Amino acid sequence: METVGRFQAGDYVVFACLFVVSSGIGVFFAIKERNKAPSKEFLVGGRQMSCGPVALSLTASFMSAVTVIGAPADVYRFGASYVIFGVAYTFVVFFTAELFLPVFYRSGITSTYEYLELRFCKLVRVAATLIYIIQTILYTGVVVYAPALALNQVTGFDLWGSIFATGIVCTFYCTLGGLKAVVWTDAFQMVVMVVGFLTVLIQGSSRAGGIENVWSTSRTGGRLQVFDFDVSPLRRHTFWTLSVGGTFTWLGIYGVNQSTIQRCISCKTEGHARWALYLNLLGLWIILFCAVVSGLIMYSYYSHCDPWSSGLISAPDQLMPYFVMEILGAFPGLPGLFVACAFSGTLSTVAASINALATVMYEDFVSQCFPDLSNRAASWISKALCVAFGVACTTMAVAASYMGGIVQAALSIHGMCGGPVLGLFSLGILFPFTNLKGAVGGLIVGISLSFWVGVGAFIYPAPSNNTHALELNTAGCNITAAAFEPTSATVTQLTSDRNWLADSWYSMSYLYYSAVGFIGTVAAGLLITLLTGPMDPKLLKPGMTRSVKEVMCFCTEKFTEADLGEGKEDVGDFGKAWEKHPDQGCTLRMDEKFRCSCDNQQENGNTNAGFDHNETSIVQKKL
């Protein structure tokens, strides 16, 4: 592989500024919050965050360096159909904001998995927490290693230096500043990501002959064929796999993921939390747009000489760094800006993961074993957990360098684990009659199905005709025949002992792994519940479940207010209302004209230990 340039002093300075500013934010909040010892202040920011920084933090955390580097390469090879993920993002944010968020926010919990104990039992909570910890450590390690390797091979940027710097800096500001430092650092890193992308878009389009030429070349090369309505689940990317499969995959990441919900419940009101999610949707669209256009510009620039097929680079993930070094290498500091852009995605993802891991470990294990810890002891333990998980994630990144092809399996863990856990929460929230046996049995079935298809796909790779990779041209390359490696070398070599499962079940699009786990969990959970005897929904206090009418009836909170006995307080301000009186005994009513109202319904007995059961009243309010 040839290199088009190496990092210069100016590039290292620009890149170092990212780490210095990120660390500085952690120091700032450590000093500012030094007299606030409670662990809740450290783990959820005192529940006083506003929607703006939380929205930026959410976007930055889930648009990792894998997106910054991998998405443009995907568009380069398979076309702009990747943009359909925007449809999936829309559904994901809606269901998170209207279905899952109200339940988590109003219950006053810190760990999302605490809900599972309130709804089912501690065993279910522990199982889901362990799944989350394993999946997050594994995925976070890969998120650190994969982009560092691609950048190292193209730019010469030090591999181990970047890995250890990422782990040390993230652990540093997470430990010092807690969630507030994570959120504000993510906000800064989101700005860096956008600036880095814009730099590539402006210079790249100029070098490719302008946007009009980019559009024309992309159309000629088939990159603008966005809508493929083939319903086959075996096709890698179609409208249905990206929109439906993408929705299930990202809903498992957003809807019930500790990292997302932790920042949402850190908001001062439920209204701020909702706004954070919807503003985050705008951020997701912006990053997605930048990634797709970058891929089209890159294809237009290399339309006559593909560097991957011609052997100039050894893997598709190196396309974006190679392109950046070629178009920005003559401008001191700009390659460093792009690397800062890529590592902003990595830093935000790793920091969010470390903070979330520390939270679930403390809430789901430490506080359960030692319920009488002082505030100061709890705060120090929370910080120690941040350090421990920072070391674990960095160690996982180092281990990824020795894993070879296992890295691909690790990147699929989110889908394989996220779907069954999403199904578990859906059983609890949407189906009030689901019993404990149904929840446990459904989770086992869902995990088994999703890992069956995921591991099977790793052992028996899907045939290349399922991916529909578009043609790449090397006619304009100034290379010798001996140096040329044809594109056909990348075609998956299929073994002769493949059985019928290999070409059907194991060849399913990776975006459906989460859907398989979700459907398996819900279907098995409901069947087992019906066979073993459904639970009486009256045994559950209101707030543990959420009906479809409540999800779709947007006026529910807007036209009601809570009387807490100490003055009126808007129901939209559930951060305070539910902290004092989380069980409001509210039942939604809808008349024949589809007008919503919320009637008070008091129930005696069958209380849930997770809620405070003082009386409240809900009254209709005309706006």
UniProtKB/Swiss-Prot annotation:
Keyword terms: Cell membrane, Glycoprotein, Ion transport, Membrane, Sodium, Sodium transport, Symport, Transmembrane, Transmembrane helix, Transport
Membrane topology: Multi-pass membrane protein
Sites where a glycan is attached: N465, N478
One Gene Ontology CC term in the entry: apical plasma membrane
CDD domains given in the database record: SLC5sbd_SMCT2
Transmembrane domains' residue ranges: 11-31, 51-71, 84-104, 130-150, 159-179, 182-202, 237-257, 277-297, 323-343, 387-407, 413-433, 439-459, 511-531
Extracellular-facing ranges: 1-10, 72-83, 151-158, 203-236, 298-322, 408-412, 460-510
Compartment list: Apical cell membrane
Gene Ontology terms for molecular function: monocarboxylate:sodium symporter activity; secondary active monocarboxylate transmembrane transporter activity; symporter activity
A Pfam family per the record: SSF
Cytoplasmic topological segments: 32-50, 105-129, 180-181, 258-276, 344-386, 434-438, 532-623
Function as written in the Swiss-Prot or TrEMBL entry: Acts as an electroneutral and low-affinity sodium (Na(+))-dependent sodium-coupled solute transporter. Catalyzes the transport across the plasma membrane of many monocarboxylates such as lactate, pyruvate, nicotinate, propionate, butyrate and beta-D-hydroxybutyrate.
Gene3D superfamilies, alphabetized: Sodium/glucose cotransporter
Family that this chain belongs to: Belongs to the sodium:solute symporter (SSF) (TC 2.A.21) family.
Catalytic activity: (S)-lactate(out) + Na(+)(out) = (S)-lactate(in) + Na(+)(in); nicotinate(out) + Na(+)(out) = nicotinate(in) + Na(+)(in); pyruvate(out) + Na(+)(out) = pyruvate(in) + Na(+)(in); propanoate(out) + Na(+)(out) = propanoate(in) + Na(+)(in)
Protein name: Sodium-coupled monocarboxylate transporter 2
Species of origin: Danio rerio
GO BP annotation list: monocarboxylic acid transport; sodium ion transport
Main location: membrane
UniProt key word Transmembrane helix: yes
